[in-house]
């Protein structure tokens, strides 16, 4: 059970880290749009995915650690 949860979390973070498309912000449409500085949910997700890209080396090391754990600890 714990191994399944760790594997799920690892795969989810890997999927976010290897996304390779441009994440653009929506351009303002009107005159007063620059006054609105509230971040939407889409903006927060975009920032999170962009921050994951900077941690690719740590994610790779985590993957190696997880492979080791799957062989040694969770193997039958």
Curated annotation (Swiss-Prot):
Top-rank lineage group of the source organism: Eukaryota
Disulfide bonds: none
Membrane-side (Extracellular) residue stretches: 18-54
Broad class of the protein's primary localization: membrane
InterPro entries from the UniProt entry: SMIM7
Compartment(s) of residence: Membrane
UniProt keyword list: Membrane, Signal, Transmembrane, Transmembrane helix
Transmembrane domains' residue ranges: 55-75
Cellular compartments per GO CC: membrane
Membrane-protein topology: Single-pass type I membrane protein
Signal peptide: 1-17
Cytoplasmic side: 76
Family listed: Belongs to the SMIM7 family.
Protein name: Small integral membrane protein 7
Organism: Xenopus tropicalis (Western clawed frog)
């Amino acid at each position: 059970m714990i191994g399944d949860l760790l594997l799920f979390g690892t795969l989810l973070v890997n999927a976010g880290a290897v996304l390779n498309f441009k994440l653009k912000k929506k351009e303002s449409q009107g005159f007063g749009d620059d006054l609105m500085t509230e971040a939407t949910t889409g903006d927060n997700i975009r920032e999170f995915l962009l921050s994951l890209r900077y941690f690719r080396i740590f994610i790779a090391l985590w993957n190696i650690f997880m492979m080791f754990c799957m062989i040694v600890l969770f193997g039958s």
